[in-house]
Curated annotation (Swiss-Prot):
InterPro entries attached to this UniProt entry: Phytyl_CoA_dOase-like (IPR008775)
Amino-acid positions noted as binding Fe cation in the UniProt annotation, renumbered to this chain: 156, 158, 246
Organism the protein comes from: Danio rerio (Zebrafish)
Family statement drawn from the similarity comment of this UniProt entry: Belongs to the PhyH family. PHYHD1 subfamily.
Gene that encodes the chain: phyhd1
Molecular functions per Gene Ontology: dioxygenase activity; metal ion binding
Protein name, per record: Phytanoyl-CoA dioxygenase domain-containing protein 1
Pfam families registered for this protein in UniProt: PhyH
Length: 291
């Protein structure tokens, strides 16, 4: 049975995003969260990694782009932290399970539970219904959106970071492992904004230069009134077109908002930009979604 109806497909093409209920069962969500707790419990944080992740553009360049740890994380499982979770000596000032912004970017390759969800029959069915011929998996992330400190994610388009020629070949699958409501930082979209192209790209700088990445162009200013909330219940998912403008507010509630998200690219007749921060490696070529 198809996960998407014809009406769903049309809505996704018209608006650039689609909320789906029940992609995962509550038990599957809980299993992913338990496995993530085990990963955190055993994590060994390198000294240089006690640099904090930021969603602010300048901070993002300074901390992520300048750090080899980030730019070489495409084929690894690595840890990125919220602001203010370390003291001056690099020690945790909050419980370590509450310190993380995200873990990325190869859970889909190296963690069996996450791999199973990524390649699930439902996800494959969605891609076939969207007429994807040879979709590959680019990256995956576990995003925590910690209670009280989970930072705002400013308006952006995924194609800024995951650029292809032609455009329109990348889709995010954003799976809520807990209820994602307005109170704890659900996604907001500008419907139809995926038709307007992109105005900014994050690119690798020439070898031997610093920082390791830079931005070309600038993000447009968006009217806040154009954004529509996309709350989703535990186990539901949001399909995200690579050019649709979206954001999420800071999580000021006392409830976390754990999410597993991954990006898919239609590789048929598509050029993946060699300037993107994320590149396939010998250790991990972009794996085919279809099994």
């Amino acid at each position: 049975m198809d996960v998407l109806t014809d009406q769903d497909v049309q809505k996704f093409r018209d608006e650039g995003y689609l909320v789906l209920e029940g992609l995962l069962s509550p038990e599957e969500c809980d299993a992913l969260r338990r496995r993530m707790s085990e990963i955190i419990e055993s994590m060994d944080v390198p000294e240089h990694c006690r640099t904090q992740f930021s969603t602010d553009h300048d901070e993002q360049l300074k901390t992520q782009g300048n750090a080899d740890y980030f730019i070489t994380s495409g084929d690894k499982i690595r840890f990125f932290f919220e602001k203010g979770v370390f003291d001056d000596k690099g020690e945790f000032v909050v419980p370590k399970e509450q310190s993380l912004n995200k873990i990325g970017h190869a859970l889909h390759a190296y963690e069996p539970l996450f791999k199973r969800v990524t390649h699930s029959p439902k996800v494959q069915n969605i891609c076939k219904k969207l007429e994807l011929i040879n979709p590959v998996i680019l990256q995956s992330m576990y995003i925590f959106k910690q209670p009280g400190i989970g930072g705002e994610v400013t308006p952006h388009q995924d194609a800024t970071f995951l650029y292809t020629q032609p455009l329109g070949r990348v889709m995010g699958v954003w799976v809520a492992l807990e209820d994602a409501m307005q109170e704890n930082g659900c996604l907001w979209f500008i419907p139809g904004s995926h038709n307007d192209g992109i105005t900014r790209r994050m690119v690798r700088t020439p070898k031997g230069t610093f920082p390791l990445t830079d931005f070309i162009g600038r993000e447009k200013d968006y009217d806040d009134k154009l954004f529509v909330p996309a709350p989703v219940k535990k186990g539901g998912a949001v399909l995200i077109h690579g050019e649709v403008v979206h954001r999420s507010a800071a999580n000021t509630s006392d409830a976390s908002r754990h999410v597993y998200t991954f990006h898919i690219m239609e590789s048929e007749n598509t050029v993946w930009s060699p300037e993107n921060w994320l590149q396939a490696t010998e250790e991990l070529p972009f794996p085919s979604l279809y099994t």
